[in-house]
From Swiss-Prot:
Cysteines joined through disulfide linkages: none
A single BP term in Gene Ontology: chaperone cofactor-dependent protein refolding
Localization annotation: Cytoplasm
Protein name according to UniProt: Co-chaperonin GroES
Family per similarity comment: Belongs to the GroES chaperonin family.
Gene Ontology molecular-function annotations: ATP binding; metal ion binding; protein folding chaperone; protein-folding chaperone binding; unfolded protein binding
Functional summary from the UniProt entry: Together with the chaperonin GroEL, plays an essential role in assisting protein folding. The GroEL-GroES system forms a nano-cage that allows encapsulation of the non-native substrate proteins and provides a physical environment optimized to promote and accelerate protein folding. GroES binds to the apical surface of the GroEL ring, thereby capping the opening of the GroEL channel.
Broad class of where this protein is predominantly found: cytoplasm
Assembly notes: Heptamer of 7 subunits arranged in a ring. Interacts with the chaperonin GroEL.
Record key words, sorted: Chaperone, Cytoplasm
SUPFAM superfamilies: GroES-like (SSF50129)
Length: 96
């Protein structure tokens, strides 16, 4: 499935990191708190302003971003991996 977001929507692939407990034990995904970090894989053209012009997007493909825990709609890519489709306003920060 090729997702092309509309308006001010962004498609983000969530970054999954393996985590260890303080004792050095690897925690399975179900025991970890989900990181709200991801990489932007697609962006829409921008938000329409009241005068009809398009406000360009701040984020671009390849940016690493931080977003809210309940942000966006989860969908799956062709390989079955989760993606999040969210508004640019749901992105809290660009991580460098």
């Amino acid at each position: 499935m090729n997702i092309k977001p509309l308006h001010d929507r962004v498609v983000v692939r969530q970054v999954e990191e393996q985590k260890e407990s303080t004792g050095g034990i690897l925690l399975p995904g179900s025991a970890q708190e989900k990181e709200n970090l991801g990489e932007v894989v697609a962006v829409g053209p921008g938000k329409a302003a009241d005068n009809g012009s398009i406000i360009p997007m701040t984020v671009k493909v390849g940016d690493k971003v931080m977003f809210g825990q309940y942000s966006g709609q989860e969908v799956k890519d062709d390989a079955g991996k989760p993606l999040k489709v969210m508004r640019e306003d749901d992105i809290i920060a660009i991580v460098e």
